[in-house]
């Protein structure tokens, strides 16, 4: 009997270790489909393994979000000109992220809006935030009535445009849905000094829900020194960053380097490449693809 019990205890320990590896001890990873600007591309990227997408948002002269459009130049090997009217895209996105909808994609849990605010004057940033919130509330969140469930990151390229965040928040509050800010996170995407990014969040009055991007077009190489600085901030007791993502990663070797550096998200034109690396024995033990149950605003503690 003792022998049997001995085996049983070894087996249960092994099972426990498996469970821990399956969830708690593995870093959840967001595979972020890059430049998903046409509704048809949502399914295309998710079916290749993306659990997150990045969508460009261009503005008109009055700071209204207008198109999901990148334009030329863009990443090597991509069509830069695909687009939708912003509100049409939001409706398509809502279908893809609303349980019960025939177009529902359960795996799609995070959307990064790459806000092309470079066309705006600095004093239009607050207004752009308000108008963005109005559009999302109506066409994505369905005025708070069983809308899309994905978490949203507002990615701003210019630190001077931090008032966009306040405009966005104020508008949701004014329209009676401040609780939707629970679903909203932030990113400054200009590769600025990490200290300067921290100062911009202080001015904006933001703590928490912070993703930090680092990267460059896939046409050019870029080292990991700033990623390492962002990860160090995230992992320090007094850091302000919750998650770090790296863009645009299309090669297996770069994917491994980024994972080894400890990123939480990898933006890519080829989600299947990232998926393949995550399935390699060395990485399967340490990482897993994030699901809806993984709160993207919570810092993962090793």
Swiss-Prot record:
S-S pairs: 74-80, 76-219
Top-level taxonomic group: Eukaryota
MF GO annotations: lyase activity; metal ion binding; phosphoric diester hydrolase activity; toxin activity
BP terms from Gene Ontology: killing of cells of another organism; lipid catabolic process
Record note on cofactor: Binds 1 Mg(2+) ion per subunit.
Entries under InterPro entries matching the protein: PLC-like_Pdiesterase_TIM-brl
Its EC number(s): 4.6.1.-
Catalytic activity: an N-(acyl)-sphingosylphosphocholine = an N-(acyl)-sphingosyl-1,3-cyclic phosphate + choline; an N-(acyl)-sphingosylphosphoethanolamine = an N-(acyl)-sphingosyl-1,3-cyclic phosphate + ethanolamine; a 1-acyl-sn-glycero-3-phosphocholine = a 1-acyl-sn-glycero-2,3-cyclic phosphate + choline; a 1-acyl-sn-glycero-3-phosphoethanolamine = a 1-acyl-sn-glycero-2,3-cyclic phosphate + ethanolamine
Propeptide intervals in chain numbering: 15-22
Subcellular localization(s) per the UniProt record: Secreted
GO CC annotations on file: extracellular region
Signal peptide location: 1-14
Tissues/organs with expression: Expressed by the venom gland.
Top EC category: lyase
Record keywords: Cytolysis, Dermonecrotic toxin, Disulfide bond, Hemolysis, Lipid degradation, Lipid metabolism, Lyase, Magnesium, Metal-binding, Secreted, Signal, Toxin, Zymogen
UniProt keyword RNA-binding present: no
List of catalytic residues: 34, 70
Known cofactor(s): Mg(2+)
Residues that bind Mg(2+): 54, 56, 114
Recorded family membership: Belongs to the arthropod phospholipase D family. Class II subfamily. Class IIa sub-subfamily.
Function, as annotated: Dermonecrotic toxins cleave the phosphodiester linkage between the phosphate and headgroup of certain phospholipids (sphingolipid and lysolipid substrates), forming an alcohol (often choline) and a cyclic phosphate. This toxin acts on sphingomyelin (SM). It may also act on ceramide phosphoethanolamine (CPE), lysophosphatidylcholine (LPC) and lysophosphatidylethanolamine (LPE), but not on lysophosphatidylserine (LPS), and lysophosphatidylglycerol (LPG). It acts by transphosphatidylation, releasing exclusively cyclic phosphate products as second products.
Protein name: Dermonecrotic toxin LiSicTox-alphaIA1bii
